[in-house]
Regions:
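An anion/pyrophosphate-binding glycine-rich loop and adjacent beta-alpha core
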Residues: 1-75, 85, 132, 136-138
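Glycine- and aromatic-enriched mobile tails/lids
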Residues: 5-8, 87, 93-107, 111-312
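Active-site-proximal helix-loop elements at catalytic-domain edges
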Residues: 60-85, 200-216
């Protein structure tokens, strides 16, 4: 709100969100995005891409507010929590061939534990994931399908279509997303995350009562179950990692410091023999391209440092 730039890099990250959060909590907010210094051609390009492709509702929203990028700054805020490669590597573990830990299962894009690479990265990683998967399939002989398992899964997936007096999927999804925002949103605390786990377990009963009237609602019903699983995984992984890391994304008030001696590792989840989620550590592999110490700590140094004059 003072009209001063406070971070070096505009690319979003957990540390950027931490500095953003600090500004809001310190009373310096709101935080604004300034683009009125850009050339008219650049602003038109932003509007053309953002308003017609990436975020169609953004143009209508700003028009309704009377915000003109050429003369007005855009008020910004921290978005709600998300799990899509949250800090650049938070999806299904894959190796350099896009193989997961499940033999024959491959993953690419934002659901894989890969750095941010957007559309071009999805194309590239998806290409060699497909090539490697095809090579794997060519070497596997056809096996007999278990029809009883198939029928059981079909019955589970299509169950909402047979529930005439159930709950609308969008209502259960809204309730679940509120739980995520209320109990998993950083800053994180053990107490809130444990309550969240309890709520995620309870909402399984609501999911069983979801009703679907058409294929679209059936899809939404299936998505609610997936969202619930992701919420539980996020809570358990956050409880397991007893430190703070990646700026605001994993800031725990009960463990506010980064602890490289114990937690410079991957925190993974798997199912045990009873189907329950369990956490374990996986070592970090050596960097392909070594980085120096300045690069290693640059992530934590996004705030612009001001020279403070000493009093006489």
């Amino acid at each position: 709100s003072k009209g001063e730039r406070f971070i070096e890099c505009d690319y979003w990250s957990g540390q950027m969100m931490w500095e953003f959060y600090q500004e809001l909590e310190s009373g310096n907010g709101p935080v604004y995005l300034k683009v009125d210094h850009l050339a008219e051609e650049t602003i038109q390009t932003i509007e053309e891409i953002l308003h017609t492709n990436e975020r169609p509702s953004r143009g209508r929203f700003h028009e309704g507010r009377g915000t003109n990028y050429r003369q007005d700054m855009v008020e910004m805020h921290i978005s709600e929590i998300g799990f899509c490669s949250g800090h650049s590597a938070s999806g299904v573990w894959v190796n350099e061939k896009a193989e997961t830990s499940v033999k024959g299962l491959y993953s690419a894009g934002d659901m894989a534990a890969v750095p941010h690479n957007y559309m071009l990265g999805a194309f590239t990683y998806g290409w060699f994931a497909g090539v490697n998967a095809a090579q794997y399939v060519n070497a596997v002989e056809d096996s007999e399908l278990n029809q009883s398992e198939i029928e059981a899964e079909k019955a589970r997936i299509f169950a909402p279509l047979n529930c005439s007096e159930g709950l609308p999927p969008e209502q259960v999804e809204y309730k679940l997303r509120r739980f995520v925002n209320d109990y998993l949103q950083p800053p994180k605390t053990r107490q809130k995350m444990e309550i969240g786990l309890k709520r995620f377990e309870e909402i399984k009963q609501d999911i069983k009562r979801i009703s679907a009237r058409n294929p679209h609602e059936l899809m939404r019903a299936a998505e609610v179950s997936f969202i619930r699983d992701c919420a539980e995984m996020a809570a358990r992984a956050s409880l397991f990692r007893e430190e703070s890391r990646w700026g605001l994304y994993h800031y725990r008030t009960d463990f506010p410091q980064k602890n490289n001696s114990d937690w410079f590792c991957h925190a993974h989840l798997k199912k045990d023999e009873h189907g329950n989620m369990v956490s374990f550590k996986k070592p970090i592999e050596p960097y392909v391209v070594p980085i120096n110490q300045d690069e290693a700590v640059s992530y934590d140094r996004l705030r612009i440092q001001k020279d403070v004059a000493l009093a006489d």
